[in-house]
């Protein structure tokens, strides 16, 4: 799980670049939709290693249940 954090942060930082591009406008030659498309593509590509590790480590099949609260007739669990 420790390896997922830097890859996820890289993905999120690359997704914030179009927001900052509207403030500074560094690319006057390229249109904004092309810049956003390229940034989202790079963010998707950088998120693939962590997604692959997540799937290969069988974490998506982990089931957990949290017993939250019990009253007289109601049993609340979060699953």
Swiss-Prot record:
Enzyme class name: translocase
Transmembrane parts of this sequence: 5-27, 40-57
Reactions it catalyzes: a ubiquinone + NADH + 5 H(+)(in) = a ubiquinol + NAD(+) + 4 H(+)(out)
Keyword Transferase: no
EC numbers: 7.1.1.2
Compartments reported by the entry: Mitochondrion inner membrane
Keywords, in A-Z order: Electron transport, Membrane, Mitochondrion, Mitochondrion inner membrane, NAD, Respiratory chain, Translocase, Transmembrane, Transmembrane helix, Transport, Ubiquinone
Membrane topology: Multi-pass membrane protein
Coiled-coil positions: none
Disulfide partners: none
GO biological-process terms attached to the record: mitochondrial electron transport, NADH to ubiquinone; mitochondrial respiratory chain complex I assembly
Keyword Mitochondrion: yes
One GO location term (cellular component): mitochondrial inner membrane
GO molecular function, one term: NADH dehydrogenase (ubiquinone) activity
Subunit: Core subunit of respiratory chain NADH dehydrogenase (Complex I) which is composed of 45 different subunits.
Function: Core subunit of the mitochondrial membrane respiratory chain NADH dehydrogenase (Complex I) which catalyzes electron transfer from NADH through the respiratory chain, using ubiquinone as an electron acceptor. Essential for the catalytic activity and assembly of complex I.
Family in the record: Belongs to the complex I subunit 5 family.
Protein name: NADH-ubiquinone oxidoreductase chain 5
Species of origin: Macaca fascicularis (Crab-eating macaque)
